[in-house]
């Protein structure tokens, strides 16, 4: 697959599919710019080579029609401050006005198209819409790993009509680190998996059991495994319809010689709001009127004793309700510990990435993925539609 640095870009219109689907506060200011900063190497390379950078993204779920709430205007303003140059916002992502704006661009200019999802055709992967987007540019670049699991027009459809295609540096890095961690990992290898539900990660667990040496399970999903083992979990979140699944996964791991580590103690409280009535108890002694909201300190010690000898570690999903102190201690302790290791540490998007950032460990781990759903699908062994389409386009161009 070609990368953007290999192309001759001077004077060319370069359509860069980015993922600027970032959280905004009540004043419509960017709260977390990880995904914006992730595209800067690609954008700066296009500017440096004299290309005309046309940025395209979605934001939120505007349901196929324009909405001021989902305008990319605040994102463009934030990007402008990051690169210290104007980033004007086009009135739309296709149409006569957009074509005219692009025609006026000079080498090194940047233009941000308005929200792709203001058009229902984007998510429908509509052929005419895909062609209209492709007609805006001479070169198509995908630098949006986080949406590459979606067969949408700007990710999949327009590659069929693009004159030339390439991967951006962020997409290239995502694939490189993922393959380094999963295809031929330095061993021992561990997967740390957390979050709320077993049901959302069954495919991941099934795929990984034959590939890892150690599996560390935390978060609310551990409750389902506890109950499958006959343990009391109080009023904790449990997926009762997946108890057999949890038992089957534990049995499969044992048959393949994969050591599974579940928490040995838990932080419990009557509710998320009851921060003053918090206890740490062994997992065998969870009170019937309490919720498990985090792993305990002994669990962290056990997890660290396993992970310290691993050479490859992939982490996806928090160990507790980390958005609500004091139930963030387990997740933050893990983030800090992974940042201290001399191992390949790949953090898989979403809440895990947010936790690593909040713990100031972004620069200490090997790689923090920008993808949530895309990362999970790759963990399941699924080929991402956007990546497959890009590889096919690169092969033609």
From Swiss-Prot:
It comes from the Bacteria. PROSITE patterns: PGLYCERATE_KINASE (PS00111). InterPro entries: Phosphoglycerate_kinase, Phosphoglycerate_kinase_CS, Phosphoglycerate_kinase_N, Phosphoglycerate_kinase_sf. It is found in: Cytoplasm. Pathway: Carbohydrate degradation; glycolysis; pyruvate from D-glyceraldehyde 3-phosphate: step 2/5. GO terms for biological process: gluconeogenesis; glycolytic process. Gene3D superfamilies: Phosphoglycerate kinase, N-terminal domain. Belongs to the phosphoglycerate kinase family. PANTHER family: PHOSPHOGLYCERATE KINASE, PHOSPHOGLYCERATE KINASE 1, CHLOROPLASTIC-RELATED. This is Phosphoglycerate kinase. It comes from Syntrophobacter fumaroxidans (strain DSM 10017 / MPOB).
């Amino acid at each position: 697959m070609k990368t953007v640095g290999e192309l001759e870009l001077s004077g060319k219109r370069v359509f860069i599919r980015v993922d600027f689907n970032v959280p905004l506060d009540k004043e419509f200011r960017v709260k977390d710019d990880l995904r914006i900063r992730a595209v800067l190497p690609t954008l700066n390379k296009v500017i440096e080579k004299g290309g005309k950078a046309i940025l395209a993204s979605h934001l939120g779920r505007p349901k196929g029609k324009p909405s001021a709430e989902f305008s990319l205007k605040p994102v463009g303003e934030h990007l402008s401050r990051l690169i210290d140059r104007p980033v004007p916002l086009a009135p739309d992502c296709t149409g006569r006005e957009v074509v005219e704006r692009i025609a006026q661009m000079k080498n090194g200019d940047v233009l941000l198209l308005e929200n792709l999802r203001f058009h229902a055709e984007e998510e429908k992967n509509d052929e005419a819409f895909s062609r209209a987007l492709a007609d805006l540019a001479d070169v198509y670049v995908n630098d949006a790993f986080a949406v590459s699991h979606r067969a949408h027009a700007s990710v999949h459809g327009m590659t069929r009509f693009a004159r030339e295609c390439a991967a951006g540096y962020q997409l290239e890095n995502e694939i490189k680190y993922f393959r380094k961690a999963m295809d031929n990992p330095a061993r021992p290898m561990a997967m740390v998996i957390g979050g709320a539900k077993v049901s959302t990660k069954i495919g991941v667990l099934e795929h990984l059991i034959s590939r890892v040496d150690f599996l560390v399970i935390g978060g609310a999903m551990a409750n389902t495994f506890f109950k499958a083992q006959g343990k009391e979990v109080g009023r904790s979140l449990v997926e009762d319809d997946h108890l057999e699944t949890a038992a089957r996964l534990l049995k499969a791991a044992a048959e393949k010689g994969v050591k599974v580590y579940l928490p040995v103690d838990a932080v419990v409280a009557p509710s998320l709001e009851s921060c003053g009535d918090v206890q740490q108890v062994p997992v065998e002694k969870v009170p019937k009127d309490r919720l498990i909201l985090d792993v305990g300190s002994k669990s962290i010690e056990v997890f660290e004793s396993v992970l310290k000898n691993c050479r490859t570690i992939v982490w996806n999903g928090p160990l507790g309700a980390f958005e609500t102190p004091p139930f963030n201690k387990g997740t933050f302790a893990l983030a800090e510990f992974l940042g201290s290791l001399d191992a390949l540490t790949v953090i898989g998007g979403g809440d895990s990435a947010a936790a690593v950032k909040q713990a100031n460990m972004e620069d200490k781990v090997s790689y923090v993925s920008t993808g949530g759903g895309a990362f999970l699908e790759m963990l399941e062994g699924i080929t991402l539609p956007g990546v497959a389409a890009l590889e096919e386009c690169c092969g033609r161009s």
